[in-house]
From Swiss-Prot:
Listed name of the protein: Uncharacterized protein Rv0968
Protein family membership: To M.tuberculosis Rv1991c and Rv3269.
Cellular component GO terms, alphabetical: peptidoglycan-based cell wall; plasma membrane
Origin: domain of life: Bacteria
Induction: Highly up-regulated during the early stages of invasion of the human blood-brain barrier.
Amino acid sequence: MVWHGFLAKAVPTVVTGAVGVAAYEALRKMVVKAPLRAATVSVAAWGIRLAREAERKAGESAEQARLMFADVLAEASERAGEEVPPLAVAGSDDGHDH
């Protein structure tokens, strides 16, 4: 009876281990066959894509934070009784009088 309980618990563990070893060996053989340069280029391309996406999201977040801060500052100035000048975008002076 004790052996039956032991085997009932051990068999799934052994099967899981065997499947893991088989998957590891298959992956190892596939990596050995694949050219290292192609794999390196693929990983670098993924890294570039991720960096661009992170940069885009950071830019959007920075713009959102700037606008939120400007709104808070304008409301605070308004409550304090000061007139709030419109925000100017840096580098927007094109030399024309409108």
